[in-house]
């Protein structure tokens, strides 16, 4: 390990160590599968896969005679066909068999038949938090989606409340503020008046509705109160006699008051709009929206004579008709249907989260009921009305209390739920069969829906992604990513600015910096360093508890909901050894506001300054001195750094380098403390101190030169020697892009910030050829080429070195089986695997047919279908793999074997490669200068790299300058530094180090021109900067074509390197050539080099013959245009200067020749 000097303003030690950075994946999958509990035979919790089975079973037959009951499930780990390594090599999935113990119970006879039923295979997660599917490592990204529960919001003039379940119908309430009416919508269908909806749910009288929402006051009817009563609303109906009935909700008139007095009504109950009940302490509604809705009912329904309430039939017709238009209605069925939509566990599920959110909102303790209750509906309506009245506030949809995370375990649980409901349906159908008494449990279960659903999820789901494996940081970040897209999430086109924007609740939970540039900005984000997901799926972040102004060591994890209105101090607030704050006023944040307050008001304190950013951003030293846009680019570009052959850790680090290396899974860590008894390049054997016997040894296999998903090289190197003692968790072998157990993505280079003859104009980079000679930025890239050997209708294909019409020189590189030898250097067009395919009879010439009939099968002609090295690829063959049916057992139909050839290429840094620092300072290598021509320091040390000073002021990423200054001191003092984010070294500390190293405190030095030896006019800033080589290499982009494939319709060359295409000459390029007057160049570009079919054949002929040429015919695109115009019914013909018709098609040519 490297000894680092802590240099910064804060404390070197932190109260809380960083958690395992991939625990979001590991914990979620463990909750889903409960493998640890299965191994230790402990009872399983009702979550994940166990909850799916418990919810579906028992499955009962229609008549109730037969029941299929669930006991438990097993994962057959011993039955794993292949190890992780073999799965990758053979293109298989790393999965185990899932079996479920079922009891088939015959209730009439009491007989029970038990069986362990096969339920398909289930992919297993590797220790690194990945899955291996068809030989490729994949990651299931966590999804951030709208939380189930209730949310209140406003759109234009509509105040809305929405109850979102985990599964089931959406219920929306909306108040039309122009008309003062409240409506309800179920599943976004037609609006229903709220009073009708309430009546359908059982509030069948006006009185019930009014007393549910309004406070009621009793008033004595006397001459004195006579004037105050008109205009008020009755809360209870008054029935004086047959023709004198006053309904609840009716407005009282002066005449009504007179009638009350005359008929001896001494006391009446009225609606009290005060909205607060002094006795119960309960808040009621204070607007007349509900009363308006009761009035509106009367306008819709003409009541029958003498009826005092709406008949049930009318209510059900109105409600059910809006929900299911055109369906015949039976009143009882309609009532049941309406209730099952929300109150049946089969059709509706709020989920644990939905119930938690509702209870939290309305102050209940109930956390078990999974369906809606009448109280939920009433409370939602009351709360919405209070918001409308201005007594309560709207919800913030982008608040992290209203968004939750679905990790891999929950996503898979949902997949299994959907598949098992189909299995249940099939089982019930089979139970209805007359022969049910002869059945066994396994005959009732159909595995197909489960197998196909799981396969589809891992292979095609938007959230199951091919792992980004460029370097360890890219892997780690991919596993910690949160995605708002995907099934049940947002769509790129409809996501507005608000959803993408940074919100104050993201603090300590989601990184405000790391997100892609482009259409996904803000929709794909990263977890903050200390963040974790709680049981309900909400993101939590840790805080230190502050009691009476004293900081304690007690830690609490708070979700965004818990944190609301709490007073939180920053991590760098100064306090003494007793935990008392040193200042009278401390900077704090309360919800989204930043202010200062007295220490006694503080509730919590941040645990670390890097708490609010992601792992990638926390690797950028002096982050606080960079503009946010450049920090974003720096975070993203570190993930694109190619692992180098000889990387070095940065001189100026942040302390996160070792954590990332440890948790990324690319290094080898000791499982137990012990002594190394064997250390070779491919294997380490450790004898543990607590070994029970001589055979109890820990073996570690070292990975050598394997290909990653992105064609970079995965290579581990041993760090320990035989006889060395190692501790548990110690790193004993480095992986790609790690050195001495620290992340090492690039190298430290001596930098001069100086323009140099225009070669570093516009972000271009000038480098010394010392970098190339010493292989500082040399990387290995491994490509895989594969070919299938099939059984065809005409006979099997063969792998052979006996290939027709191929020169001996090319075949020399193949072995006796026709496969390239390992160690051979191959170039484009070389054969890697010789393969011949039988030709069909139609392809055979008459002479061959004669030979076949004389000599039989021996003379059968074959076609050369060999695997060749594609254009633009060369390198050394490092491995060949042959996978046969015997090896795997389930190759695709018709495939006999698969051959894979791995070609490795050492790529040195060259002009056109992209490089970048950690501060978003990216550029392309424009020139590699001989070391003797580079500017040099007074002691003769030549610079390694020259960057343009104009790249700093407008980009505002000053961090790169501070890093360079401290790096310079570190290089000459032989020190490495930890400069934590947001607590980085001050200018004074850097200058002190520079002075100690013998440099000018400004780090400006006199530089000498490498050409002339003369000093430059001004002093130049010199430093040591950490630069990375990015995965945008010129070798992958450079491309040339002479002839190649053409598009079928337009006959123009295809586009792009992958299609071996041409270079597009667009509209503006044509203008440029026109403006220049290059008529002949333009003509040949638009005709013979593009789509003039006859012209290009002639010109090729003439070039071969060496004859000067100037031919051009009609471009094919002109013919396409002509045919389109003819398709519109326009008869067009073309004539040349002599007046002869020019044929456009072969048919036309025949007709012209005939005439």
From Swiss-Prot:
Keyword Transferase: yes
Keywords, comma-separated and alphabetical: DNA-directed RNA polymerase, Nucleotidyltransferase, Transcription, Transferase
Transmembrane segments: none
Catalytic activity field: RNA(n) + a ribonucleoside 5'-triphosphate = RNA(n+1) + diphosphate
Subunit details: The RNAP catalytic core consists of 2 alpha, 1 beta, 1 beta' and 1 omega subunit. When a sigma factor is associated with the core the holoenzyme is formed, which can initiate transcription.
Keyword rRNA-binding: no
Family membership: Belongs to the RNA polymerase beta chain family.
GO biological process, one term: DNA-templated transcription
InterPro entries (alphabetical): DNA-dir_RNA_pol_bsu_ext_1_sf, DNA-dir_RNA_pol_bsu_external_1, DNA-dir_RNA_pol_su2, DNA-dir_RNAP_su2_dom, DNA-dir_RNAP_su2_hyb_sf, RNA_pol_bsu_bac, RNA_pol_bsu_CS, RNA_pol_bsu_protrusion
Top-level taxonomy: Bacteria, Pseudomonadati, Spirochaetota, Spirochaetia, Spirochaetales
Enzyme Commission designation: 2.7.7.6
Name this polypeptide is given: DNA-directed RNA polymerase subunit beta
A Pfam family this chain is assigned to: RNA_pol_Rpb2_45
GO molecular function terms listed in the Swiss-Prot or TrEMBL record: DNA binding; DNA-directed RNA polymerase activity; ribonucleoside binding
NCBIfam families: PRK00405.1, rpoB
Biological role: DNA-dependent RNA polymerase catalyzes the transcription of DNA into RNA using the four ribonucleoside triphosphates as substrates.
HAMAP family assigned to the protein according to its UniProt record, in alphabetical order: RNApol_bact_RpoB
Gene name as annotated: rpoB
PROSITE patterns per the UniProt record, alphabetical: RNA_POL_BETA (PS01166)
GO CC list: DNA-directed RNA polymerase complex
């Amino acid at each position: 390990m490297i000894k680092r000097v802590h240099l910064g303003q804060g404390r070197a030690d932190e109260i809380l160590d960083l958690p395992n950075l991939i625990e979001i994946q590991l914990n979620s999958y463990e909750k889903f599968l409960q493998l640890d509990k299965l191994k230790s035979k402990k009872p399983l919790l009702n979550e994940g896969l166990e909850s799916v089975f418990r919810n579906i079973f028992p499955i009962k037959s229609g008549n109730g005679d037969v029941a299929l009951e669930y006991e438990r499930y097993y994962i057959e780990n011993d039955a794993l066909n292949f190890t992780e390594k073999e799965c990758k090599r053979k293109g298989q999935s790393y999965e185990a068999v899932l079996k479920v113990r079922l009891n088939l119970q015959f209730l009439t006879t009491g007989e029970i038949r038990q069986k362990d039923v096969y339920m398909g295979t289930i992919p297993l997660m590797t220790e690194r938090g990945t899955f291996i599917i068809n030989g490729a490592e994949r990651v299931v990204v966590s999804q951030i989606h709208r939380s189930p529960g209730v949310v209140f919001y406003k759109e234009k003039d509509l105040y809305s409340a929405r109850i979102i379940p985990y599964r089931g119908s959406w219920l929306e309430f909306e108040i039309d503020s122009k008309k003062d009416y409240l409506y309800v919508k179920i599943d976004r269908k037609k609006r229903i008046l709220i009073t009708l909806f309430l009546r359908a749910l059982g509030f069948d009288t006006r009185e019930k509705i009014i007393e549910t929402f309004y406070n009621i006051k009793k008033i004595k009817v006397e001459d004195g109160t006579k004037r105050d009563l008109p205009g008020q609303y009755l809360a209870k109906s008054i029935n004086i006699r047959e023709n004198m009935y006053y309904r609840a909700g009716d407005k009282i008139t002066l005449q009504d008051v007179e009638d009350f007095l005359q008929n001896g009504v001494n006391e009446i109950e009225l609606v009290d709009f005060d909205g607060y009940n002094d006795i119960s302490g309960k808040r009621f509604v204070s607007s007349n929206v509900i009363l308006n809705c009761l009035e509106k009912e009367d306008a819709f329904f003409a009541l029958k004579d003498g009826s005092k309430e709406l008949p049930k039939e009318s209510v059900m017709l109105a409600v059910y008709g809006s929900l299911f238009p055109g369906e015949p209605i039976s009143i009882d069925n309609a009532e049941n249907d309406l209730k099952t939509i929300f109150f049946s566990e089969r059709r509706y599920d709020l989920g644990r989260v939905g119930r938690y959110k509702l209870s939290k909102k309305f102050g209940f303790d109930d956390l078990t009921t999974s369906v809606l209750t009448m109280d939920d509906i009433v409370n939602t309506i009351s709360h919405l009305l209070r918001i409308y009245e201005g007594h309560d506030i709207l919800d913030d949809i982008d608040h992290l209390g209203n968004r939750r995370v679905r990790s891999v375990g929950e996503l898979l649980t949902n997949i299994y739920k959907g598949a098992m409901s189909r299995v249940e349906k099939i089982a019930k159908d089979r139970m209805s069969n007359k022969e049910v008494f002869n059945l066994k449990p396994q005959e009732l279960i159909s595995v197909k829906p489960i197998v196909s659903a799981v396969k589809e999820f891992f292979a095609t789901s938007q959230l199951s992604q091919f792992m980004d494996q460029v370097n360890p940081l890219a892997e780690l970040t991919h596993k910690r990513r949160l995605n708002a897209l995907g099934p049940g999430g947002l769509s790129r086109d409809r996501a507005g600015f608000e959803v993408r924007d940074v919100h104050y609740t993201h603090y300590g939970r989601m990184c405000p910096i790391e997100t892609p540039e482009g259409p996904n900005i803000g929709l794909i984000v990263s977890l903050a360093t200390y963040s974790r997901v709680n049981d309900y799926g909400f993101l939590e972040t840790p805080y230190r508890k502050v009691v009476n102004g004293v900081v304690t060591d007690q830690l609490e994890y708070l979700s965004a909901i818990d944190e609301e209105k709490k007073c939180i101090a920053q991590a760098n607030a100064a306090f003494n050894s007793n935990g008392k704050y040193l200042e009278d006023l401390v900077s704090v944040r309360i919800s989204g506001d930043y202010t200062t307050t007295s220490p006694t008001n503080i509730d919590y304190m941040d645990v670390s300054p890097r708490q609010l950013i992601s792992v990638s951003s926390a690797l950028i030293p002096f982050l606080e001195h960079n503009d946010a846009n450049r920090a974003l680019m720096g975070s993203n570009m570190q993930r694109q750094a190619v692992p180098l052959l000889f990387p070095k850790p940065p001189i100026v680090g942040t302390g996160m380098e070792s954590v990332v290396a440890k948790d990324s899974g690319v290094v080898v860590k000791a499982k137990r403390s012990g002594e190394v008894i064997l250390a070779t390049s491919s294997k380490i054997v450790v004898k543990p101190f607590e070994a029970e016997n001589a055979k109890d040894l820990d073996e570690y296999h070292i990975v050598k030169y394997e290909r990653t998903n992105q064609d970079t090289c995965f290579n581990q190197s041993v760090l320990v020697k035989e006889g060395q003692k190692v501790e548990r968790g110690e790193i004993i072998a480095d992986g790609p892009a790690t050195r001495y157990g620290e992340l090492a993505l690039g190298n430290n280079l001596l930098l001069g910030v100086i323009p140099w003859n225009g070669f570093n104009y516009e972000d271009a980079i000038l480098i010394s050829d010392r970098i190339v000679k010493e292989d500082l930025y040399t990387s290995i890239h491994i490509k895989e080429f594969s070919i299938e050997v099939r059984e065809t209708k005409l006979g099997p294909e063969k792998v052979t070195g006996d290939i027709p019409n191929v020169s001996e020189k090319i075949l020399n590189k193949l072995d006796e089986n026709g496969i390239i030898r390992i160690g051979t250097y191959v170039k484009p067009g070389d054969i890697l695997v010789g393969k011949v395919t039988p030709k069909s009879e139609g392809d055979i010439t008459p002479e061959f047919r004669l030979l076949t009939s004389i000599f039989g099968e021996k003379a059968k002609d074959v076609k050369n279908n060999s695997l060749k090295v594609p254009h633009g690829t060369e390198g050394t063959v490092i491995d060949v793999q042959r996978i046969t049916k015997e090896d795997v057992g389930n190759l695709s139909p018709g495939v006999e074997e698969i051959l894979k050839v791995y070609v490795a290429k050492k790529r040195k840094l060259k002009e056109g490669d992209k490089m970048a620092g950690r501060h978003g300072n990216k550029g392309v290598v424009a020139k590699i200068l001989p070391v003797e021509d580079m500017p040099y320091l007074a002691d003769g040390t030549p610079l390694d790299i020259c960057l343009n000073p104009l790249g700093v002021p407008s980009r505002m990423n000053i961090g790169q300058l501070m890093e360079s200054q401290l790096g310079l001191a570190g290089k000459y003092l032989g020190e490495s530094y930890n400069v934590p984010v947001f607590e980085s070294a001050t200018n004074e500390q850097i200058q002190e180090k520079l002075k100690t190293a013998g440099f000018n405190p400004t780090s400006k030095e006199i530089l000498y021109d490498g050409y002339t030896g003369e000093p430059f006019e001004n002093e130049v800033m010199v430093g040591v900067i950490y630069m990375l080589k990015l995965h945008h290499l010129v070798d992958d982009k450079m491309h040339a074509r002479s002839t190649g494939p053409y598009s079928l319709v337009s006959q123009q060359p295809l586009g792009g390197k992958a299609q071996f295409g041409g270079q597009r000459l667009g509209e503006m390029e044509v203008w440029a050539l026109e403006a220049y007057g290059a008529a002949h160049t333009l003509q040949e570009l638009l005709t013979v080099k593009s789509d003039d079919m006859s012209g290009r054949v002639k010109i090729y002929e003439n070039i071969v013959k060496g004859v000067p040429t100037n031919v051009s015919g009609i471009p094919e695109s002109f013919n396409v245009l002509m045919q389109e115009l003819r398709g519109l019914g326009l008869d067009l013909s073309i004539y040349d200067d002599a007046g002869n018709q020019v044929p456009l098609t072969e048919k036309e040519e025949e007709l012209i020749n005939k005439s």
